[in-house]
Amino acid sequence: MSVYAIVLFLHIVGALGLFVALGIEFLTVSRLRSAQTAEQARDWLSALGPIRVIGPVALITVLLPGLYLAATSTGWQGWNVAGLGAMVVLAGLGAASNATRIPGIGRSIGVLRGPLPLEARLRLRDRLVWSSVIIRIGIALGIVFDMTVKPEVLGALVVLFAFALVAAAAAFVTGRSAQVLATERSAS
């Protein structure tokens, strides 16, 4: 067994861990959007706890072996440079949206009991949080495509942009329930 094989294995395990974290986040955010009581919302918010460990460990386990592989075997090519940039975007989107907004959502639920008031339900359906997780899943799938097909830099960037665009469209279409609630609120 070579060092290359072990490092590649770690790189792939890191990618799997990243998708586990994104899957937990997707499930949690989608369930938060349908929570009817403060207790349900708190239960689902608590499911995000493991992401605080899995996410950073997965990111490091993708990046360090990936950098090693680029430096020792593949060199810097369009697909891995684009993938590295996309990983930075993934981390930035997660930090800018969910890492800042989810704690605020948790605080807004705080001491509430029983059925959620409309204001709290609107916060649980935050379109930025929903869009962020969907777009990050799309970008992550684009990275996997680039790592598999290994296109030149322009092709790699087009793939990443296309995956992000499709994911953004999916987030827009599926995130409309917040608009429905807002309309419901203004009609009351």
Features from the language model and the residues they span:
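Polytopic transmembrane helical bundles with strong interfacial aromatic enrichment
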Residues: 1-188
